[in-house]
Each structure stands twice: as C-alpha cells, then as structure tokens.
C-alpha cells in the first residue's frame, strides 16, 4: 500500500500551494517536509532528489516529481480531474495556464521591494478585472454548465477558485461583478473535500507575510 504523498517545500504558499489545493480537492491526505534552512535544500540537492535542483518536489507513487505543472497534471490524471479526452485536456490546460499567469503575479507580490508594491498591486487588480476574470466569466456563460470543462470538476476549476480567493485577499469584492465566477467559487468551496481544506487548521497556507518572506529568502537566496 503506497504511503501518502510527501510535499517538500518551505512553510508558505509559493509554487506548492496549487498542489496542496489540488490534492485536497481530490480528497488525498498528504504530508509536508518543510525546508527551514539552506542546508535542508542542499541536502535534497546533494542526494539527487531534485532533478533541476529546485523545489517544489513531491514524492508520490515511488517517484520524486518536480516542476509544478508536471506535478499538477499527474495528480489531475490520477484522480480523474483532467477531462475525458484530448480536447477537454487541451481546454483544461489553456484555462489553467491563464490562471497561472495571474497567479504568478500574485505569488511574487509579497517579495517585491516596498517601492514597487503599489504599482504591482494595481497591475494585478487591472489584469484580474479586465483580462482574466471576464474571460472565465465568458466561458461559463457560453455553455451554462457548472464547471469550466465537461460539466465536471477539473484542475482548472480548482486553480481558478484558488486564484479567486487569493485576489480577493488583495481586493475584497473584486469578484462581485462576475456572478458566474462567484457561483463557481461557492460551488467548489462547498464540495466536502474543499470545504474541509478551507477550515482553520488545515494545510492551506495563509498569505505570505513578512516573516514568511524572510524565511523563504534565507532558504533560497
């Protein structure tokens, strides 16, 4: 019987948070090995665990997987969150990559110099309000179904709902003008596995505060 997946990263959101969300949505329990020092990262590098000397890394099914997209695609395939055919998978990839583009801006925001944060936040809000959220609202309106692809939960829905939560932390109410996105967020949030993940005390990480940023810098810089 294989053990639980083990996630290797620091104790913050970063590039691991979408993986945590997807595993949680799939109802998969996982363990975390938090890097606390540069030496912790060096040990993973020296023992050959990191193909490109980078985290996140996930131990699952006897493999040590790196590269966020590869990890997400494996989990999505394994737990039937990746569509029923090539066409659906292409759409899921397209929607998920759009999410990743904006999520990357959100991810970098806490790590930016103080003098650049105001402009960065304004850019995130503008891109969310005028480019990304309208695009996903249009998709949901075009087919009138509950989920983005195939009327079934996929990794694209999970990543989009995660993004909605993260952007709303920065600008409460930004989703209010997108009723179908709000409905999707409610629908996904009420799934038992996700509802559990959204409760206090879960493995979901809070916004990267100054302490988290300093910890990450000590490990990776």
Swiss-Prot record:
Liver, nasal mucosa and epididymis. Its main location: cytoplasm. Induction: By ethoxyquin, oltipraz, butylated hydroxyanisole, and phenobarbitol. SUPFAM superfamilies: GST C-terminal domain-like (SSF47616), Thioredoxin-like (SSF52833). One of its GO terms (cellular component) is mitochondrion. Glutathione binds at residues 9, 45, 54-55, 67-68. One of its GO terms (biological process) is response to stilbenoid. Conjugation of reduced glutathione to a wide number of exogenous and endogenous hydrophobic electrophiles. Has substantial activity toward aflatoxin B1-8,9-epoxide. Belongs to the GST superfamily. Alpha family. This is Glutathione S-transferase alpha-5.
